[in-house]
Design a protein with these regions (language model features):
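P-loop (Walker A) phosphate-binding loop of NTP-binding proteins
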Residues: 261-262
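Conserved RecA-like ASCE ATPase "motif II neighborhood" in helicase/translocase motors
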Residues: 14-16, 351-374, 379-388
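Active-site-proximal, substrate-binding regions of enzyme catalytic domains
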Residues: 2-118, 124-229
């Protein structure tokens, strides 16, 4: 059955190619959507760029035919601009001059002739109003991944026979030797993914554990389990796995995805390895550490803020500097005598260009070579932004995506549509991607913080 999908502006602002994702159905753009795209085309950042991409796509279709009558797209669907439905009545409580309500008028006006009609929007309130008016509404699902509980964690606990357990560090263990137990105590074969981290337990003594990683048809021991990057020693299994992923060369592990709640040392450990690789590595594996954080306030583009680039992004980078202060002042033997001396050391590192910070808006279109690139708070990125970063990685560059899918501050994103979860699910199984999700038990915050997390 052919459906008519009415597209809201916020869909095109996040996914400018969205019109091509509805198969051989009708795609309806209310005229007010074009008005909103026109008003956004000069905006700085991702919003303006996507508005321009959507407009260019519509211009290509305009050259092929009459958009008011409908133009066929490459996927077989028909795109049409709807300029009518101005006389459709809405409840008095819905002002007719509001763009969202004009979109509702289009949905209501065309459904008599073009059933079924589906409104596609990321606006939760608009979906609620649509339901009240008897209009089917949904989110844009093409970029949605599964619910967070079922998303790839990058780690598993598996069991193995005692004799195989004893041989693990020397020989590793074949995947077919690993097993899990179901509810009835029966042994079942685990589903494992390339580069997945394993907590290996001996079946006769489950308190004994080894840590490993899936490589081909075997689980192998961690290569960097004895490392202490920048003097930092891992405190739990998650940090050992994180260290392994970060210490691997850019050739073997050019992409690392780390998910977990605040306090699990995601940023701290990533910076520690970066400092070790850039400051203490004579081979010059990386030229610099580049740190970026997305501006969660999507409607407040950083380009409008006063000052130069570094002044603009300084508030965004304050948590990064806090971690740097803790790392640089962590050596008991070389602890700095006062705050001024510590700040002087940090300023020296920045002045030498060994650590650089940039806002996401300023790195679009650039390629990075021999760079240790940390993207903090990546859950506030769109899938399109993450794709743009990963596909720009130059030779010798390592990209580290950090974030918590449960702490999203950006409008129209959730735990299923954010860029971090999107990259995690689609890069699962890649031999070039290492992933780890830190557990709640691995949080290194104070007892008060942990108690508050449980209670509040």
């Amino acid at each position: 059955m052919i459906k008519s999908y009415v597209i809201d502006t916020n869909i095109l602002i996040q996914a400018p190619y969205a019109c091509q994702c509805f198969e051989e159905n009708r795609v309806i753009l209310p005229l007010v959507v074009l008005e909103e795209l026109d008003g956004l085309k000069k905006a700085e950042g991702e919003k303006g760029a996507n508005a321009r991409r959507a407009i260019r796509f519509l211009e290509k279709l305009r050259l092929k035919g009459d958009l008011l009558k409908g133009v066929q797209m490459e996927n077989g669907g028909i795109l049409r601009v709807e300029a009518n439905c101005v006389n459709v009545e809405l409840p008095e409580s819905l002002p007719e001059d509001k763009p969202d309500n004009r979109i509702l008028k289009v949905c209501k006006g065309i459904r008599e002739e073009e059933k079924p009609v589906v409104l596609v929007t990321k606006d939760l309130v608009l979906r609620l109003k649509a339901q009240i008016l008897g209009i089917e509404a949904q989110d844009f699902s093409t970029e949605q991944v599964i619910e967070e509980e079922g998303q790839y964690s990058g780690r598993q606990i598996c069991y193995v026979a005692e004799d195989k357990f004893k041989e693990f560090k020397k020989k590793g263990v074949h995947l077919k030797e690993l097993y899990l137990s179901d509810e009835d105590g029966n042994k079942i074969q685990p589903e494992l993914t390339e580069n997945e981290f394993i907590i290996l337990k001996a079946d006769q003594s489950v308190k004994k554990t080894h840590l490993g990683r899936v490589e081909g048809k075997k689980v192998v021991s961690l290569e960097f389990r004895k490392s202490q990057p920048y003097g930092i020693k891992p405190r739990n299994a998650g940090q050992y796995f994180l260290q392994e992923a970060l210490m691997k060369s850019a050739e073997k592990a050019p992409l690392v995805i780390v998910k977990g709640m605040a306090g699990t040392a995601k940023t701290f450990y990533s910076l520690a390895v970066g400092l070790e690789k850039v400051l203490n590595n004579p081979t010059g594996e990386y030229r610099r550490i580049l740190i970026c954080r997305p501006n969660a306030q999507f409607d407040q583009d950083i380009g409008f803020l006063p000052g130069d680039e570094q002044e603009k992004i300084s508030p965004l980078m304050r948590p990064i500097v806090d971690n740097l202060e803790q790392l640089i002042d962590s050596d008991e033997e070389e602890r700095y005598q006062d705050e001024q001396e510590l700040q002087g050391k940090i300023e020296e590192i920045f002045a030498r260009g060994l650590i650089q910070t940039e806002a996401m808006n300023f790195i679009r279109g650039r390629s990075f070579v021999k760079t240790y690139l940390i993207i903090d708070e990546a859950q506030n990125m769109t899938p399109n932004q993450v794709k743009g970063i990963i596909t720009r990685a130059g030779k010798g560059t390592k990209i580290v995506l950090l974030g918590d899918p449960n702490q999203i501050d950006r409008p129209f994103l959730d735990e299923r549509t954010n860029g971090l979860s999107y990259a995690s699910e689609y890069m699962k199984g890649s031999p070039l991607c290492y992933q780890i999700t830190m557990s709640t038990e691995e949080c290194e915050r104070s007892e008060l913080a942990m108690d508050a997390i449980r209670r509040l």
